[in-house]
Amino acid sequence: CGMYDDEMNIIATGSCFGNTLRCMAVSSAHQGEGLMNQIVTHLISVQFERGNTHLFLYTKCNSAKFFGDLGFYEIARIDGQIVFMENRKTGFSAYLERLKKESEQSEVMKRFTSDNTQILSETSSETQKDLRIAALVMNANPFTLGHQYLVEKTAAESDILHLFIVSEDQSLVPFSVRKQLVLEGTAHLDNIIYHESGPYIISNATFPSYFQKDADAVMESHANLDLTIFVRIAQALGINCRYVGEEPNSQVTGIYNEIMAKKLPENEISCTIVPRKEANGAVISASTVRTALKNDNIELLKTLVPETTLRYFQSEKAAPVIAKIKAAENVVHH
């Protein structure tokens, strides 16, 4: 949206993207006139009309107080760079409570506590120190043999694995399908607690770039903010190690992994970067799978995905997803 003066010069603007407010600015000649307040109020109204009632925004540190006065609450900040905020006072704390409840009520935890006669909670930190409680975050767009290998390795090396599936629908394969394929492809493992990432584990798709001077600075801010939030999640669940797949061909992921390898140990969380599984002389990637689907290369697909994923894509239910992949101009980075 935009606001204009009498000569139709734009003097204030703001935008909606998904469940976020962004790109908000007021002309320097019109500061102090309450225009930003009007812009934010209008954007919130638009979002509510769209059915988006849980809203988020990113802002510079020196603007956080202003948005706080408009009903937004700080989730996390990187000093001197960026603040992540939401319009629910207890939004993030309620999310952490939900994760803890999911963990406590899971069959994994029930079986584990029954076998060990000790309850895993924040109050039993000494118990947790003796356990390897791992975390994996994956988009699985879609679930491949590479994902399966990473999950199997992490589960084998851990007492309990918290597996977070990115729930934002910014991918060619919708979340409901991605989740289904992850669950089916890991059903043979008995120490996994599954979580939907919710809106707090931040994806590249929703992280804004307009605050930063270049792509590396964007990635550094994204990584630091995402990891700050992850540390709080880890503390709530007793997670003491995180696994991640190596991305030798991705500068973006390389920066993220580099920051993660430094930041997590500072918070008593180890970081294990796992070399990627290969097939046909190359690393297995979801983008290669999407390319195979786009080109109807079923023989290649069979070498890249587990039976559960293959069965889905050969079923009638997959037709709309495959059609979407075929219609996309770029299936490599999506």
List the predicted regions and their residue ranges.
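Short glycine/proline-centered loop/turn elements that form peptide/ligand docking sites
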Residues: 40, 61-63
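N-terminal charged segments
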Residues: 1-4, 76
